[in-house]
Amino acid sequence: ILVTTENEIETGKGLLGLWDSQLNYRRIGQIASGGIGPHEVKALPNEMGIVVANGGIRTHPKYGRKKLNLEMMRSNISFFDLNYSLKNKLKLPKEMQLNSIRHLDVSAQGKVAFGTQWQGDQSEIVPLVGYIDQMQTLTLIELNILNQSELKGYIGSVAINGGGSLISATSPRGGISHIYNNNTLVQKFWKTDICGVASVNN
């Protein structure tokens, strides 16, 4: 089954489209994504289901890229089983309400790495990268002000290695990539407009 992230334009409701690859990718249904603005979906290992990053931001074609609900937005990460039933929904702390969860990656053991994009005052320095372990505990990676500010409030992509110990996050706005070993920043490098990142040879 191919799963696509979609939006119901008039209501703002997030949707997941379901398409059967054995039927020439015919659409066979849709389900609620668990939030507003689903941005990325990944399969969980061992046929455990799927995980979705709901960014929380409502838009409408009539208004272009204008963000319509920042005063009440709340992003989340939603977990679904193989029957596409919602099993769990995790949110960032209340003070992180304006942090839009956009990108995901999943390790071979089911640890979920995620990256966010800060929608609040850009002078505020907030965590932008985190992970959810196999017990479904959410952790934000805390950095010092210098390292955090390099990311310019914007994560463009994340990747996690097979073992789940290493997470890479990129910021095209900052032109920088960070690599974390669990909660510790261990490496960084700079490249203009750096963005897409993937794990290779897990």
Where are these regions (language model features)?
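Repeated scaffold domains used in trafficking and secretory/extracellular systems
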Residues: I1, G35-A43, Q97-L104, E150-A159, ...
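Asp-box/WD-like beta-propeller blade repeats and closely related beta-sheet repeat scaffolds
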Residues: I1-P45, A53, R58-H60
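Conserved beta-propeller blade signature
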Residues: L2, I50-V51, A113, L166-S168, ...
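Short, conserved, GDST-rich strand-edge loop motifs in beta-rich repeat architectures
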Residues: V3-K13, V52-M73, G115-V126
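Beta-propeller blade signature
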Residues: K13-L23, K67-Y84, V126-Q136
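Surface loop/turn motifs at the tips and blade-to-blade linkers of beta-strand repeat domains
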Residues: Q30-G34, K91-Q97, E142-K152, Q187-T192
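Short coil/turn segments that connect the beta-strands within blades of beta-propeller domains
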Residues: N46-M48, Q109-K111, G163-S165
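Loop/turn-rich, solvent-exposed surfaces of beta-rich toroidal or solenoidal domains
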Residues: N147-N182, K188-A198
